[in-house]
Every structure is written in structure tokens, then in C-alpha cells.
Regions:
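N-terminal helix-rich structural modules
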Residues: 1-93
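Contiguous, non-catalytic segments that form substrate-binding/exosite surfaces or channel walls
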Residues: 56-184
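C-terminal, non-catalytic "cap/extension" segments appended to globular domains
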Residues: 73-88, 108-111, 293-390
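Short pre-active-site segment immediately N-terminal to the catalytic Zn-binding motif
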Residues: 180-200
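Post-HEXXH active-site segment of zinc metalloproteases
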Residues: 194-198, 210-238
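Short active-site segment of divalent metal-dependent hydrolases/proteases
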Residues: 201, 205-209
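Post-HExxH zinc-binding segment in Zn-dependent metallohydrolases
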Residues: 223-257, 264-267, 335, 368
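Long, amphipathic alpha-helical stalk/connector segments used for oligomerization, subunit docking
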Residues: 245-324
């Protein structure tokens, strides 16, 4: 449906431009952002072409490399320490909705209808029909994303996602290049038709979010927003979920829309489950490692430290042996959760956009109408209405 660009010369151009601009780094934050952006683009380019694009002399710029790494480590520690300080609030916030939400979802997954959806599979959608569906949705719900879609098609800026371990479980990703103030969108090949449409909306919504943020702040701060905010996935899921609802209201591939939406909600439940575990994980262990931790190790560490507080016996052999990360658990919990909460309330969403930067702050969330009680009520009502119909 969308021809993915496998010519990565544009990435090479961006890499060279960042190398030329290394001397512009005049602060620790700029060094961190330049280094992180540079390493991401280099990694993608190398995975895609098996060629190292780095200028060795430039790559050894000590200020950018060492100050950038040092600052990134500092930002990471701040993010982890803030999570540890507010872990009880995360635990209370997520648990207020998690159990009832997961019960509703699991009941639907156990139904005959979901079994029918699963066995039916995804429909084949022609290129023309797919484009018509997208443009109709853009016109009605998010015209700015539609303009981005036209631009990315015209400039051939939908790149094929190479095999990068960091993104191995994702169908797409968006990298914000603060130096050129541009976004690069990567999509996996062979994504099924309706899933591809929703994926395009998700990733281009990231682009719109970055552009909107950059219009009100510096490019460096825009990158920092993407690095540290627990809410950077909310705008993407907000538009993606509205797309599913648009399909349902207009009776467009209803079964496929429900199946794809449910798959995203299952991912959200898994992320919330991981976030609840991290909120009980020993602080010292989390400070040492917050990325790619075996889930079994997290559970066992919790059981060792809090055995007397947990009356239920757990068998770690029942846990799928997968690696989990704190940042992903946070972002992919609040992203779908807040999208579900606000998708019928544009005024609330606009208020949320004003506070989406920075760290988790339950007082700010409550002030605009996103207290844990309000989120719980809206998500459960939305879930019951949705699953009650289908």
C-alpha cells in the first residue's frame, strides 16, 4: 500500500550534518541531544546498509561524546530517581484502573466473538481504498496529520525499519532530529493493511506532536521532552484510537478495527502490569538497571524483599520469559490509558497538551481533570460501552 524507502541517503546526509554541527554544542543538554540523535541515526543507517557512516575524527569529539554520554546518564538517573520517589503514586494511579479494565478485556478475549475475529484475520485492502479511508479520517478528525501524510508520501520519507534490537518488538518508530528539526518515520515491511493504516496514523501523530512542541520551545527541549516525558505516547494513541472509532461508526472493516484495537489494549494491559511490578521493584536494583530486565528477575526480587507483604503465592515459572524496560512500561501504560480517557473530550485533551512535558505529577493531572478516579471512571465506561456493543 505504501512503498517504503530503502534508500537511506537522507539519513547519511543528516548524519554528516550533525557531524558538521558538533562544534555548535555549547551546553550539556545540547551535547546529550546531539549525541543521542547521532547514535540513533548511525545505528539505523548501519543496520540498514551494513556501512559505517561515521567520520572517525569527528566521532571522537570529546565534548560531544563524553559530555553527551555523561549528561544522558544523568538524565536517565534523574528519570529513574523521580520514578522511585513517586512510585507509590504510580502504583495507586495504575492499580485504580488496571484490575477492572483487565477483567473487562479478558472477558471479551474469552468470548466466541473474539475467537471469530481471531480466526477471520485481517482483510486485504487495495491501495486506492486504503488511501480513501485515510483521507476521509484525516478530513474529519486530524487534517494536520493528513498534510503530513501528503508530505511524507511526496518526499518518500517513509523508511523501511531495519532490524534494530531496540525496536525489535515494534512495527514502527519515529526519530526526532533536533539538529535539522525533522522527523524520520520507519515502518516494518509486510504489516497487514488495516494495521498499516493505524500505524501510519500513530507515527505521523508523533511527528505532529514533535512539530507542535518545537513551535513553542527549542529543538533541544523538544528532544528532551521525547526523552523524559512519561506522556510522549499519548498523542499518537489518541489519534490511533479515534481512527478505530471512526471505522466503527462508519461501519468500515468493523471486525478488523475491533481486533486491532483490542490488540493494542492487550499491549497496554501488559505494560501496566510491568509498571506495577516496577513500582514494587527494589530501588537499588532499579538504579543499577532499568532497561531489558528479565521479567522473572523483577518478580523474584519483589518476592524476596516483600514476601511478608504479599499473601498470594506466585510461581515465576508461569511468567513469560521476556525482557521489560521501565521507560516502555511507563509510556505504553499512560499512552493508551489517557487516549481512552480523552478521545471523546477534545477540550480535556487540549488541556493535557499544556502539561505533557516534564515528569509525572499527579497534582497537575488532577487539576485538569485527570485524577485517578476520573481516569478510572472514563476508561471503564468507555470499555463497557465498547465491549458491550460488540
Amino acid at each position: 500500500m505504501i512503498t517504503l524507502n530503502t534508500n537511506y541517503d537522507e539519513l547519511y546526509r543528516q548524519i554528516k550534518n550533525i557531524e558538521d554541527r558538533f562544534l555548535d554544542c555549547n551546553s550539556l543538554n545540547s551535547a546529550a541531544v546531539y549525541y543521542a540523535t547521532y547514535q540513533s541515526l548511525v545505528d539505523f543507517y548501519f543496520r540498514a546498509t551494513l556501512q559505517n557512516p561515521c567520520n572517525k575524527k569527528v566521532n571522537h569529539n570529546k565534548f560531544v561524546k563524553y559530555s553527551g554520554i555523561q549528561r544522558l546518564n544523568t538524565l536517565s538517573k534523574k528519570r529513574i530517581n523521580h520514578f522511585i520517589e513517586s512510585r507509590k503514586k504510580h502504583l495507586s494511579y495504575i492499580s485504580s484502573v488496571f484490575f477492572e479494565f483487565s477483567d473487562i478485556l479478558n472477558e471479551f478475549i474469552d468470548s466466541d466473538y473474539y475467537e471469530y475475529l481471531y480466526s477471520k484475520g485481517m482483510p486485504n485492502i487495495s491501495v486506492d481504498e486504503g488511501f480513501n479511508i485515510l483521507y476521509s479520517f484525516f478530513d474529519e478528525c486530524c487534517p494536520k496529520v493528513g498534510e503530513l501524510f501528503d508530505k511524507f508520501l511526496e518526499e518518500d520519507k517513509f523508511f523501511m525499519l531495519p532490524e534494530v534490537s531496540l525496536y525489535s518488538n515494534r512495527d514502527g518508530c519515529t526519530i526526532y532530529n533536533s539538529v535539522d528539526n525533522v522527523c524520520d518515520v520507519f515502518l516494518k515491511p509486510n504489516v497487514r493493511s488495516l494495521e498499516l493504516l493505524s500505524l501510519v496514523i500513530h507515527e505521523l501523530s508523533h511527528v505532529e506532536d514533535m512539530q507542535s512542541y518545537a513551535s513553542q520551545s527549542s529543538s533541544i527541549n523538544t528532544s528532551l521532552y521525547q526523552m523524559r516525558s512519561p506522556f510522549c505516547e499519548v498523542p499518537a494513541f489518541y489519534n490511533q484510537f479515534r481512527f478505530y472509532e471512526y471505522l466503527l461508526k462508519n461501519d468500515i472493516y468493523k471486525d478488523a478495527a475491533i481486533a486491532d484495537w483490542v490488540n493494542n489494549l492487550v499491549m497496554s494491559i501488559e505494560s501496566m502490569d510491568n509498571l506495577l511490578l516496577f513500582s514494587m521493584y527494589p530501588s537499588k536494583k532499579l538504579q543499577k538497571q532499568s532497561v531489558c530486565i528479565p521479567k522473572c528477575d523483577v518478580l523474584n526480587a519483589i518476592l524476596e524483599e516483600r514476601a511478608e507483604d504479599i499473601p498470594i503465592e506466585f510461581d515465576s515459572t508461569d511468567i513469560i520469559d521476556e525482557n521489560i524496560s521501565l521507560d516502555d512500561s511507563v509510556q505504553y501504560s499512560y499512552g493508551p490509558l489517557f487516549a481512552m480517557t480523552m478521545m471523546d473530550d477534545e477540550q480535556l485533551y487540549n488541556k493535557f497538551l499544556m502539561i505533557r512535558d516534564g515528569y509525572f505529577d499527579s497534582d497537575k493531572l488532577s487539576y485538569i481533570g485527570l485524577s485517578s478516579d476520573e481516569v478510572q471512571q472514563k476508561v471503564i465506561k468507555k470499555s463497557q460501552d465498547f465491549f458491550g456493543k460488540y
